[in-house]
Amino acid sequence: VNGEQTVPGSSFTADDCPAPTDPYAVSKFEAEQALLQLAAEGTMEVVIIRPPLVYGPGVKANFLSMMRWLNKGLPLPLGAIHNRRSLVGLPNLVDLLVCCLGHPAATNQVFLVSDGESLSTTELLRKLASALQRPARLLPVPQGWKLLWNHNFPHL
């Protein structure tokens, strides 16, 4: 809902103007607006929680793919990624949900939840490798080379 990126060195906040960029994000934003309208009419109370990537037992999608790559010991061209990404552990997300259920000040608020540390893809892979007790074989391939490769070989 917030968008795909922030100004380098900054993070998203609940006060940011939403900037959804794809149909899924637009639909989430429209649902939030509809719920907030119902809340404004006194029909119901709403708490909006916008989690980043959630990790924990049963994790799937990109996070699981990264774990599989590391478990296989594959060299990855991701050793020079300087992005920042927030994450939230499942227990922390559940704690926030429970807190919001019982706290009247949460009513009609928007919360961005995270573990409080933003990691680059490179840092995340190193931490995952350490937790998996596997080597992080990360090659520092410059971003320009990756863009050139993806442009010339989009199906690989």
Language-model regions: role of each:
Residues N2, D22, M44-S65:
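Flexible, glycine-rich beta-alpha linker
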Residues G3-S10, V59-A61, L78:
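Conserved catalytic-core motifs of eukaryotic protein kinase domains, centered on the activation segment
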Residues G9-P18, S130, F153:
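Short glycine/proline- and charge-enriched loop/turn segments
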Residues S10-T13, T21-E30, L53-G56, N83-V88, ...:
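Short-chain dehydrogenase/reductase
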Residues C17, M67-L78, R134:
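A short C-terminal helix-loop "cap" of Rossmann-like NAD(P)-dependent dehydrogenase/epimerase domains
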Residues A19-V47:
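Active-site Tyr-X1-5-Lys
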Residues E30, V59-S65, G79-G102, N108-L112:
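Substrate-positioning beta->alpha
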Residues C99, H103-L156:
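Mid/C-terminal beta-alpha module of Rossmann-like enzyme folds, strongest
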